Swiss-Prot record:
Matches recorded under NCBIfam families: PRK00162.1
Main location (coarse class): cytoplasm
Active site, UniProt feature: 65
Entry's Gene Ontology BP terms: glycerol metabolic process
Biological role: Transferase that catalyzes the transfer of sulfur from thiosulfate to thiophilic acceptors such as cyanide or dithiols. May function in a CysM-independent thiosulfate assimilation pathway by catalyzing the conversion of thiosulfate to sulfite, which can then be used for L-cysteine biosynthesis.
PROSITE patterns (alphabetical): RHODANESE_3 (PS50206)
Localization per record: Cytoplasm
UniProt source species: Tolumonas auensis (strain DSM 9187 / NBRC 110442 / TA 4)
Residues annotated as domain Rhodanese: 17-105
Protein name: Thiosulfate sulfurtransferase GlpE
Keywords: Cytoplasm, Transferase
Similarity-based family: Belongs to the GlpE family.
């Protein structure tokens, strides 16, 4: 079984420049709707079936939560169901928003 890799927000930003990389944001709906990285997939228990249908097991998946803790559990789960390249972003959205652009609603 493969394992996920913990990466920095800088490494995540670099990976997101590559084609066919998925950013999965696992924060709660109100936080996600208020602000998120443009193009992020909002991964929840409800959207998991859609995620597994749309995102192939070979697609690199970057998992983002608030600070980089909860994302590790989800990253571990994704590897356990066969995703081959899974990354947990240390610092999460809180780290990202201080350095990189994101979409916010007023």
């Amino acid at each position: 079984m493969s394992q996920f890799t913990r990466i920095s927000i800088q490494q995540a930003a670099a990976l997101l420049q590559l084609p066919s990389v998925c950013l999965a944001d696992i924060r709660d709906p109100s936080s996600f709707n208020a602000a998120h990285v443009t193009g992020a997939f909002h991964l929840t228990n409800d959207t998991l079936p859609q995620f597994t249908q749309q995102i192939t097991k070979e697609t690199p998946v970057l998992v983002m939560c608030y600070h980089g803790n909860s994302s590790q559990g989800v990253a571990n789960y994704l590897t356990s169901i066969g995703y081959e390249k899974v990354y947990s972003i240390d610092g999460g959205f809180e780290g990202w928003r201080h350095v990189y652009p994101y979409t916010a609603t007023v």
